[in-house]
Amino acid sequence: MGLDYYAVLQVTRNSEDAQIKKAYRKLALKNHPLKSSEPGAPEIFKQIAEAYDVLSDPVKRGIYDKFGEEGLKGGIPLEFGSQTPWTTGYVFHGNPDKVFHEFFGGDNPFSEFFDAEGNDIDLNFGGLWGRGVQKQDPPIERDLYLSLEDLFFGCTKKIKISRRVLNEDRYSSTIKDKILTIDVRPGWRQGTRITFEKEGDQGPNIIPADIIFIVKEKLHPRFRREHDNLFFVYPIPLGKALTCCTVEVKTLDDRLLNIPINDIVHPKYFKIVPGEGMPLPENPSKKGDLFIFFDIQFPTRLTPQKKQMLRQALLT
């Protein structure tokens, strides 16, 4: 279950921009790791930043309102026949400090944390200005939405992230962009984790967090994946279900399979086509199976003559 951005910011769906900004300011100041000693404050601070990053942008907010988190992060379909049939999915850069400093600009909302001589006070939260024992930030996990075609053939995804990089003085830092490249291998399953070690924010007293992308499968218009198998539902009229038929299935690699069905198709019947599923991650030259299920379509009405013919054929 993903984030409800409106719930995170404690606003309603019809809230105006000013209300969203006011909510972010209040919650960000309350939950900033320099202000809150609660164990969950860093994660809440990140969620607040991601929610504001989406809801403060009219385009992102519009997609989120209409298609939900899956549409926002997985991409939404464009017009039929487009060369790029899906929009690029949204990926939060994972840097709540960037959102915070862009929001407050040059103002220092934490002036109360500096002593009379202007020196920063050690709050021992391991944040950007903290001093003490060096520790690693918790991993930053982000969903990577991929189509079945991406996972069938394999592909390369390039994702831009923004992170803090230490300057030469090893104390101050600058936000810089970096491109992370993910080589998707054929057959990767949902839940596959890709780790980029220590690619998170740099700081004087922290080990940068690992960035972990977790594979999520986009919904497919024809197939549903179960492990390494593909499930396909074929609508079939009752007459063909009783008298045999040939099923045509267009595969992910654009081949057309003609599968003869010589059995009587009943509601629990299914056909297995070996080797027409997804590639096996450990051996992509081998594939799972294709399971064909049937949606038997009954007629909405029958003439008296047809009813009589069915009685003679089926009940005698």
UniProtKB/Swiss-Prot annotation:
Q: Which organism is it from?
A: Mus musculus
Any single Pfam family the record assigns to this protein: DnaJ
Q: Which residues form the J domain?
A: 4-68
Identify the PROSITE patterns for this entry. DNAJ_1, DNAJ_2
Q: What does this protein do?
A: Functions as part of axonemal radial spoke complexes that play an important part in the motility of sperm and cilia.
Protein's recorded name: DnaJ homolog subfamily B member 13
Transmembrane ranges, per UniProt, are none
> Where primarily located?
other
Source taxon at top rank: Eukaryota
Q: Record's InterPro entries? A: DnaJ_C (IPR002939), DnaJ_domain (IPR001623), DnaJ_domain_CS (IPR018253), DnaJ_subfamily_B (IPR051339), HSP40/DnaJ_pept-bd (IPR008971), J_dom_sf (IPR036869)
Q: In which tissues does this protein get expressed?
A: Expressed in ciliated cell-containing tissues such as testis, brain, lung, ovary and oviduct.
Q: Which UniProt keywords apply?
A: Cell projection, Chaperone, Cilium, Cilium biogenesis/degradation, Flagellum
* UniProt-annotated location(s): Cell projection, Cilium, Flagellum; Cell projection, Cilium
Spell out the molecular function terms from Gene Ontology. unfolded protein binding
